[in-house]
């Protein structure tokens, strides 16, 4: 079952699920209640997506403040990712103008390809980038972190240990 961390962590605490894979973002760490174990799996870098014809599209990297005046494509309001983006931009002195909201990365990139704004997009699981989109790293690297989380009282269960070990191996294979 795919769930946001705000839903999966409370279900984990209640014992409704045994293990969760959760994300947190560089300036918005996951709130983790006591009684939970966490294993870091991956660090996922985030790029700035802009229309291919944008004046900054050919740069090796950009500063966020260089796109301060742009329209933004974001996740829907109230989502953890949206709040992270707003906090990130405001920490750079940018008051974002969000013109479009979309849950899925591929939808966000399609809006960018149509010239409707700029967006940030994680590298892992991004899928094919539509024609007309340029991806440029951000100078002060943006990232999200991917963790396995489980209850301390389940830490010695062979199934939990095996699942965490398999996730750690898969993560290591991805980063090689």
Identify the residue ranges that each predicted region occupies:
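Central regulatory/effector-binding core of bacterial HTH transcription factors
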Residues: 1-29, 95, 102
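Short loop/turn segments at beta->alpha junctions
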Residues: 4, 63, 103-104, 122
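Short helices/loops that flank or line small-molecule/ion binding pockets
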Residues: 6-18, 86-92, 105-116
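Beta-alpha-beta core module
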Residues: 15, 30-40, 44, 106-155
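Secondary-structure junction motif
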Residues: 23-29, 57, 70-92, 156-165, ...
């Amino acid at each position: 079952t795919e769930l946001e961390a705000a839903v999966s962590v409370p279900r984990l605490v209640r014992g409704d699920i045994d293990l969760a894979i959760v994300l947190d973002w560089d300036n918005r760490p996951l709130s983790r209640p006591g009684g939970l174990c966490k294993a870091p799996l991956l660090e996922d870098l985030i790029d700035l997506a802009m229309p291919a014809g944008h004046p900054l599209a050919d740069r090796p990297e950009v500063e966020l403040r260089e796109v301060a005046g742009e329209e933004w494509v974001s996740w829907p309001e109230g989502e953890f990712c949206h709040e992270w983006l707003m906090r990130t931009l405001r920490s750079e002195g940018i008051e974002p103008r969000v013109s479009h909201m979309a849950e899925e990365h591929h939808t966000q990139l399609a809006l960018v390809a149509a010239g409707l704004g700029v967006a940030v997009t994680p590298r892992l699981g991004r899928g094919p980038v539509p024609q007309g989109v340029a991806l440029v790293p951000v100078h002060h690297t943006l990232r999200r972190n991917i963790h396995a989380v489980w209850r301390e009282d389940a830490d010695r269960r062979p199934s939990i240990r095996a699942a965490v070990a398999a996730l750690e191996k898969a993560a290591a294979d991805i980063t090689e």
